[in-house]
């Protein structure tokens, strides 16, 4: 299991997932090579030996990065595991990739102010199951 964050080109004026119109279709985040290149600007050691699936392994946390198998990337999913330090990596990845994130734990737009609380709730849930 992982704490997942979905990144897409979401409307900049949306304050909540509820603010995204049903008919909204996100634009591409770019060509896969360009998206991977932007990721590598902040994490040059990200392993993209599989061009559709990257892996960032750091002491205390890891992030699997799904960019899909199409040439155009419509969304990126971050599968996050580990310590609180992972939140900083998620913030850096969202900034580098572009677009906005949706926090799978809250079901809302990624919010730096509550991201630590979100990953901690996810870890607490793991301890319960």
Please tell me what each predicted stretch does.
Residues 1-129:
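Acidic (Asp/Glu-rich) sequence patches and key acidic residues
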């Amino acid at each position: 299991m992982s704490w997942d964050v979905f990144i897409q080109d979401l409307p900049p004026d949306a304050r909540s997932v509820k603010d995204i119109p049903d008919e909204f279709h996100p634009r591409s985040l770019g060509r896969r090579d360009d998206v991977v290149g932007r990721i590598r600007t902040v994490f040059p050691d990200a392993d993209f030996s599989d061009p559709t699936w990257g892996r960032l392994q750091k002491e205390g946390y890891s992030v699997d990065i799904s960019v899909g198998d199409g040439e155009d990337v419509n969304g990126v999913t971050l599968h996050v595991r580990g310590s609180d330090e992972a939140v900083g990596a998620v913030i850096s990845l969202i900034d580098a990739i572009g677009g906005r994130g949706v926090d799978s734990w809250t079901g809302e737009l990624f919010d730096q102010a509550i991201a630590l609380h979100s990953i901690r709730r996810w870890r607490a849930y793991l301890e319960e199951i």
